[in-house]
């Protein structure tokens, strides 16, 4: 069958490879000049910068795309484990190093608060059990029909997940030390949600890091996008770049998708898989005569969105290889207040930051004796935000806030004077480059009312031959999760093809 895939992000690339491996003719249409979507990369002044995701968790999910497509992961992607997860900076004189080695981790916990290891390990154990239930019965199912969700067994399993608690409440049940609570809670920001709003199941993120470890891909995260592209091409996938999809063609008589309008031209296909951000699809790509019934433009506007981010990609004329680790987190003095600012629309005065130094691990990504630095500051999305990112003064203020915070770290003292390359990325860039509604960095917020059956579906409930995958669809955001979205959606398509649907 001839299948169109809209979007060459990691979801579209992975799904296309899976479909092509089964013998189908797949064409990907990507509006930008390179593949990768949020997992893009750029080079500037001798530095190589990943633009979006940076942390490799659950490597088995990465490998599965290749192995289930009949290839060896190692032939496409060079990945290795890191012994160190991240450094946490609570203040300029208060740093905690988090290791994948349980003995070292226990020493760190006991140094932070004697006796805390038992509660921490019990947290990991209990959350791992929930993760296994969530993965098998929720994350890896498409919930095509109401009966697949609304049945006694599924609802019982959902209750076992205890999702009515938020992440903060769950963590507090196991850990009393405020620093350790922060260490666990901040990671819900990886998918753009407030830990006091996010269902407790999203506390799986620190568990995954501790149990499965954190890995690094040679050449940066873009190495995965390149590997997926090559995998697809080896199976015959065609990729058209600078190909702006303007409409999904719907046959109103038979209520089915049968093509796309791309750069003004009609292109016919047997099936369409759209991995563009779902809110954008609902509001901009569906024909006027054939909308998505449960996702009117008004409803899409009123849905809950994850936070956005302000990023600085900087080249530093300083060798930091022996002074910093690849992944680092710097906490605001008032972490709770910082979170409240983000989700109430305010620019943080004292932010929490995520710092990524890939050239510490991979010297090829920066000139000799220099270091590439990626800084992410969570900020409000554009609907909630009171921030005018078109104002150059506001951008300068955001930069000042970040550099002032960076300079509280000993290795980054007076860092501004050593910046030799700088690029910023604002919520407006998320909106324009990725068609992300309200500049949301992680798509729709995974609240209880926007999860599982209540999240935009992988199989259209309105039209035949139309499918959706990606961060704003089921099961949610984060690289392992969107790879799962690609998997279950491709499998649903193959099942429909097999049964003549």
Curated annotation (Swiss-Prot):
The keyword Cell inner membrane is annotated on this UniProt entry: no
GO BP annotations listed: carotenoid biosynthetic process
Known EC number: 1.3.8.-
A GO MF term: 4,4'-diapophytoene desaturase (4,4'-diaponeurosporene-forming)
Source organism of the structure: Staphylococcus haemolyticus (strain JCSC1435)
Reactions catalysed, as given in the entry: 15-cis-4,4'-diapophytoene + 3 FAD + 3 H(+) = all-trans-4,4'-diaponeurosporene + 3 FADH2
Pathway the protein takes part in: Carotenoid biosynthesis; staphyloxanthin biosynthesis; staphyloxanthin from farnesyl diphosphate: step 2/5
NCBIfam families: crtI_fam
UniProt name for this protein: 4,4'-diapophytoene desaturase (4,4'-diaponeurosporene-forming)
Family named by the database record: Belongs to the carotenoid/retinoid oxidoreductase family. CrtN subfamily.
General function of this protein: Involved in the biosynthesis of the yellow-orange carotenoid staphyloxanthin, which plays a role in the virulence via its protective function against oxidative stress. Catalyzes three successive dehydrogenation reactions that lead to the introduction of three double bonds into 4,4'-diapophytoene (dehydrosqualene), with 4,4'-diapophytofluene and 4,4'-diapo-zeta-carotene as intermediates, and 4,4'-diaponeurosporene (the major deep-yellow pigment in staphylococci strains) as the end product.
A Pfam family that the UniProt record links to this protein: Amino_oxidase
EC class name: oxidoreductase
Residues where FAD binds: 5-17
Keyword Oxidoreductase part of the UniProt annotation: yes
InterPro entries attached to this UniProt entry: Amino_oxidase (IPR002937), Carotenoid/retinoid_OxRdtase (IPR014105), FAD/NAD-bd_sf (IPR036188)
UniProt KW keywords: Carotenoid biosynthesis, FAD, Flavoprotein, Oxidoreductase, Virulence
